[in-house]
Design a protein with these regions (language model features):
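ABC ATPase nucleotide-binding domain signature
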Residues: 33-43, 47, 57, 92-93, ...
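ABC-fold ATPase nucleotide-binding domain signature/coupling loops
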Residues: 75-104, 108, 122, 167
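Helix-to-loop junction immediately C-terminal to a conserved catalytic motif
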Residues: 5
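A short, proline-enriched helix->beta-strand linker immediately N-terminal to the Walker B motif
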Residues: 111-115
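Catalytic Walker B motif of ABC-type/P-loop ATPase nucleotide-binding domains
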Residues: 117-121
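Conserved catalytic loops of ABC-family nucleotide-binding domains
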Residues: 129, 136-151, 157-158
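Conserved ABC transporter NBD signature motif
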Residues: 13-20, 30
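ABC ATPase nucleotide-binding domain helical subdomain, centered on the C-loop/LSGGQ "ABC signature"
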Residues: 16, 50-91, 135-136
């Protein structure tokens, strides 16, 4: 997943985005058309909830933030917080449960409606019904993205068109 996301260089072979070798692309421009969540990075940073979702992308309209919250079933829960999106995130886990953190990270990943989403085994900490809802939405043909799941979770199978097994 880290190689696919462009965070590590492959030891052999190439990673191509739309036919172009990833090594020849500017990582900032790649970040505009892909989103990812890796198991090793399942935490929020100190700042507001809004800052955690925007991740410095201040050009993204507020309406898109609201859309991402609705997509991840967080809108009502965030609105119920006394400070809403301005709620300050301190040490991860103090305010938000792991399932909330995962949905916040999914909201961050989908916020710019990227062409490619890469998820590394992230949805296992969610309540099964919520997980199914999020998976169904992520894998919907109506969305503008392709999704790659790097996982050994057999429950993903009904949601994907193609599976590649690596040994």
């Amino acid at each position: 997943a880290r190689v696919l996301a462009g965070l590590e260089t492959p030891t052999s072979g190439l990673i191509r985005y739309n036919g172009v070798d990833l090594r020849h692309l500017n990582l900032d421009s790649v970040n505009r058309f892909r989103g990812f969540i890796l198991d090793s990075q399942l935490s929020l940073f100190e700042g507001t909830l809004e800052e955690n979702i925007l991740l410095g992308r201040t050009y993204i309209p507020y309406s898109d933030v609201r859309w991402a919250l609705r997509f991840t079933e967080l809108e009502e829960e965030v609105d119920a917080l006394p400070q809403g999106l301005k709620t300050h995130v301190r040490t991860p886990g103090k305010i938000f449960a792991p399932s909330h953190i995962i949905r916040i990270l999914v909201a961050r990943a989908i916020l710019s409606r990227p062409q490619l989403l890469i998820f590394e085994g992230i949805l296992h900490n969610m309540h099964p019904a919520m997980r199914e809802t999020i998976l169904r939405r992520l894998c919907s043909k109506e969305e503008p993205w392709s999704v790659i799941f790097v996982s050994n979770d057999p429950n993903l199978t009904p949601h994907v068109d193609r599976r590649i097994l690596l040994n």
